[in-house]
Amino acid sequence: MKIKEINTRQELYCEFKKYGIGAEIGVCRGHNAMWLNQITKPKKLYLCDIWPEGDRMPRNRNPSIWRDDNEEIVKRIFEDEIKDGSVELHKNYGGHFLTELPDDTLDWVYLDANHNYEPTSLEINTAINKVKSGGFIAGHDYCTVPAAWRSGVIRAVNEQIQNGHILMEAITIESHPSFLCRVVK
């Protein structure tokens, strides 16, 4: 099977099921969530982040993005969707949030939270059960960054490909590429 090259992650989202059930793990200020919502038009979108408060900023590599109250920003962006129930916010770690969902709930999940190996591996391993067969696990930063997360995302994704649980379908050709894998059950 050929792996597609796709220009941007926004174009990658066109591969996701429209009007389905999706989740983004690692929402930050909600910029990417807006793209996911606009392109996929999900009937349900779960947005999950730890959204640190005050001095609880574990992301010391880029603390400037955590100066604002990002959770409140996301609540304002999705105010109407939260009211009508099509968007739910969850303040939790990605792997923990995913365990709360029933199996075979999601049509797709996009991972962009902690990029270290262990948490990314936990998120992918858990997502395999939560995403329907034929659905997608996708994520950002499928690359090495030695000073930060090293090869965490690549290792976690490639291990599940080797285990036969997911198949690589596409990768973006950006400096910090996104991956798209189909769940095989």
Where are these regions (language model features)?
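S-adenosylmethionine/decaboxylated-SAM
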Residues: I3, N7-K185
